[in-house]
């Protein structure tokens, strides 16, 4: 039997890459051949090859920067990327092309449509990104994590890796847990400067109550470590990136983080109370992602413009492990744990028509 082939397009941020990687690994288990479209010097260039997945690099940039120079150069990058992906498609002849959103998906989505290859989209957020909005008009099938985001789309959830789904539930995690409150700090896959600046001060003021596991991102690891060391805060674990995120979720009583779609989905699946500081996009995409958890009392949302040391200290002082356990159980009630199966069923169904 000839194996089916798929090209997955995802890059720029962990929020696009990691869901795509989860899908890729599951498809490989099912006998599919997978190629990837991404960009160099990016999170996908560091991670995807380590899983034995062939990655093709294109030169493309996002359109959030609307400077005159960017507006002039962007069409050139898009056109070059379009022809590069079109060549890959014609050479490899995939059965399906899957776009995970973000600027990497744009040229390849149009190229797959032009080559009459079924184009599938997956939207992780509660507000669709500009690329998925455009491509949804020409795609074969749209998938979304939440209802009402893309037109004519099937709700499938956000795919997360099995290690996260297997994290013990809040009842088992919190049982017999004592000692300092364990707070996980994650500013997205590339870190957050504002969290790296504020959290060492918070740690100093609450060193008798809190221990942090802080992911700083690659660029600010040493600078953030110096802040903690200067305050003689040796009990905290400071790392640039947490590869085994499931172990970090299992360890934590609470998470302070951005509210990217994948992070919110993972927190719901694991069951973990959260303090969200949404990235301040104009469309408030991350704020929308976090609203359901705040509504049921599983999380608190702080706009970045209001964020300061005193506010975080006051919130943490108001919490104890019993309250965090209640927040964790509420978060757990919203977890969607069958997303990968839903997505595979859609992909498999479309592939049988090719």
Curated annotation (Swiss-Prot):
InterPro entries named in the record: GlcNAc_MurG (IPR006009), Glyco_trans_28_C (IPR007235), GlycoTrans_28_N (IPR004276)
GO MF terms held by the record: UDP-N-acetyl-D-glucosamine:N-acetylmuramoyl-L-alanyl-D-glutamyl-meso-2,6-diaminopimelyl-D-alanyl-D-alanine-diphosphoundecaprenol 4-beta-N-acetylglucosaminlytransferase activity; undecaprenyldiphospho-muramoylpentapeptide beta-N-acetylglucosaminyltransferase activity
Pathway field: Cell wall biogenesis; peptidoglycan biosynthesis
UniProt gene name: murG
Protein name per Swiss-Prot or TrEMBL: UDP-N-acetylglucosamine--N-acetylmuramyl-(pentapeptide) pyrophosphoryl-undecaprenol N-acetylglucosamine transferase
Cellular localisation: Cell inner membrane
Family from the record: Belongs to the glycosyltransferase 28 family. MurG subfamily.
Main location as per UniProt: membrane
Catalysed reactions, semicolon-separated: di-trans,octa-cis-undecaprenyl diphospho-N-acetyl-alpha-D-muramoyl-L-alanyl-D-glutamyl-meso-2,6-diaminopimeloyl-D-alanyl-D-alanine + UDP-N-acetyl-alpha-D-glucosamine = di-trans,octa-cis-undecaprenyl diphospho-[N-acetyl-alpha-D-glucosaminyl-(1->4)]-N-acetyl-alpha-D-muramoyl-L-alanyl-D-glutamyl-meso-2,6-diaminopimeloyl-D-alanyl-D-alanine + UDP + H(+)
UniProt: UDP-N-acetyl-alpha-D-glucosamine binding residues: 13-15, 125, 189, 242, 261-266, 286
Keyword annotations: Cell cycle, Cell division, Cell inner membrane, Cell membrane, Cell shape, Cell wall biogenesis/degradation, Glycosyltransferase, Membrane, Peptidoglycan synthesis, Transferase
Gene Ontology, cellular component aspect: plasma membrane
Broad class of enzyme this protein falls into: transferase
CDD domains for this protein: GT28_MurG
Biological role stated in the UniProt entry: Cell wall formation. Catalyzes the transfer of a GlcNAc subunit on undecaprenyl-pyrophosphoryl-MurNAc-pentapeptide (lipid intermediate I) to form undecaprenyl-pyrophosphoryl-MurNAc-(pentapeptide)GlcNAc (lipid intermediate II).
Organism ancestry: Bacteria, Pseudomonadati, Pseudomonadota, Gammaproteobacteria, Enterobacterales
Species the sequence originates in: Buchnera aphidicola subsp. Acyrthosiphon pisum (strain 5A)
Pfam family, one: Glyco_transf_28
UniProt-listed Enzyme Commission number(s): 2.4.1.227
